[in-house]
Amino acid sequence: MEATQNDRTADVKFNRLKLIVCVFLPALLFWLAWEPMPFTPLVFIAFVPFFYLAEWGRSTSKGKNFGVLFLALMLWNISTTWWVWFASDVGAIAMLILNSMLMYLPFGLSRWLQRKKWFIWDAKWLFIALWLLYEYGHHRWDLSWPWLTLGNAFSGMPWYVQWYEITGTLGGTALILSVNVLVYHALMNDQSNAKRSWIMRFRLPIGIVSVFGILSVLLGQLASDFVYQKKSKLKQPYRVVAIQPNYDPYDEKFVLDPMQMVRDMAKTSDSAGPADCILWPETSLVGNIDVGSPAQDMQVSYLMHHWLKNGPADNAAGDSSLNHSRAAGPPSMLIGSNMIHWYSWMGKGKPDVAARQSSNLEYWYTLHNSALWIQPELSIHPIGSDPFKHERLRGSMATGDIQFYHKSKLVPGTEQLPFVTVLPFLERLAISLDENSASGTLGKNATAKALGVSNSKVAPIICYESIYGDYVSEYVKDGASWLAVITNDAWWNNTPGHKQHFSYAKLRAIEQRKWVVRSANTGISGFIDPLGNTTMRSGWYQGRDERSAEVALNKHLDDGFFSAGESGSKRSYEWNILGIKYGNKLEDNSLGATKITQVGTQLALSQTIYLNQYRTVYNRLGDGKILAILVLSMLLLSWFNRKQKQF
């Protein structure tokens, strides 16, 4: 077999200093490229040192090859996800080790294939196919941790990946690795390229990056008219209020009186004025609401009574400049809740992998991390014999419409113990974040489920689920016209964790071309438009001066409200002063006006969004078909470049 470029690179000399640089450099580059750092384009060269290490490993032992690459991958994981330590030290160590080992698999398999005599493909392009398969699989097993999916890196540059509505994050991963391969080969072709300018040497990777940037700008412009419906006579405005109660999950959330917390959050919700839907964060209702009779729960009953009595009509006087789609009647609510499902079982073993036995051995129960959708309804009864003569009416509370969804993408180690069906002893190793919240394997929905009615259905995305683009697609297929993320991000303290989590929601907005509204108990609450632009956001513990690391809001209510008469430049300036980003793309300022109020230490963010039932190419294809297209493309490139013996 003739010598090829891949064979020649094996002769490159690797001294100790070069090896050390290649081990530590990827961690530095990925740290600078990942949110919240602002140097995202560095991902286009961050993998080049890994390719150098892989080339060095071809001429050394398996042990040395694994050790060096594993160390480099571990440093990458530490530099970008070290903050998991604040939630669980044991969990963080296990995650870092396991994730680094899994990342090594594409390298190890590529090395094994290259050593086979029958191997005739270009190893680098084949490596991309293997990495794509690794990412796809890592989204779909019991120890799933796709936080460092390469395509997530562009959450800091949403303007560049408007084409995610076609490919999703897998397309971003393929682009990043392809550019890295081209950069690597340009660097390795020293003899033929030494006398060329760097622009000529790197013209192909630069050209590809530029083409995707231009494509993104064009797609963004096309989507902008649709997103804000500038040319449509049929607008569907929908006003949403997102609450950020700022309860410390360790010292307050599961310790304070649940009913008092509900009353406080209801009062904060009232301050926001009229709304179509009110959004409360994950586990806002902490008393394990019975799946069989949620309307009978004291907290749920209180909320329905509260909004039947204090609906938007009572709050509209102070907000006459705001238009919203619900003319009268109480708003719907989407609220995070702990739920419990009781059932009897006298058979052998456990009735379900998530089942727990009560003190009465006949009865079992399953705990859930859930989202409740509540639509209070008013039952009107006339007083007197003739209801048609404008006689005084009295209202009585009806149960209303209550729907719920149980979180399906569970956090490994805390909400789901891996492989407990075959290794049941692992159930005892559950990591508890605190002494009151549920741990161990939780019950879950079999599929994603949109909640609500008709054209205003919502995707109830609970915390960890928001990093799964393909799973979010299932909500939209079920009829969701907007995305709600309810979460509690304070487990990680004030670290990059909650910022990355918020930023990933921008990618979900682009993939589905849907508005995203985020309600965080602590962390970042806000609104993201279908182009991935943040139109309004809060800060870490914003409203609690003793905890907030950002500029605190003025204590006056409605300080964040801007009327239609104010200029866009003034809005941007004032919102930036508050530490809040605002987008100026809304066609009708009265409909899109943002408002933020503060009651005590709690915040209420409100804005009018536009609903749509549009399904993107990504939503229709799904990760499976996109993976097949990308892997086939990489295999063809691998074959072509090996046969041509050059790039």
Which positions does each model-derived feature cover?
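Membrane-embedded alpha-helical bundles of multi-pass enzymes
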Residues: 2-227, 494, 505-508, 519-520, ...
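Short, conserved active-site loops that position catalytic residues or coordinate cofactors/metal ions
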Residues: 34-51, 76, 81, 244-245, ...
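A generic fold-level signal
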Residues: 36, 158, 235, 328, ...
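Active-site catalytic loop in hydrolytic enzyme cores
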Residues: 84-90, 137-169, 353-469, 558-587, ...
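CN hydrolase (nitrilase-like) catalytic-core segments centered on the catalytic cysteine
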Residues: 99-102, 129, 277-278, 283-285, ...
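Residues at the C-termini of beta-strands that transition into short coil/loop
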Residues: 154, 244-246, 337, 375, ...
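Class I S-adenosylmethionine
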Residues: 215-217, 256, 484
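Soluble catalytic regions of membrane-associated enzymes that act on cell-envelope
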Residues: 220-416, 450-455, 459-476, 501, ...
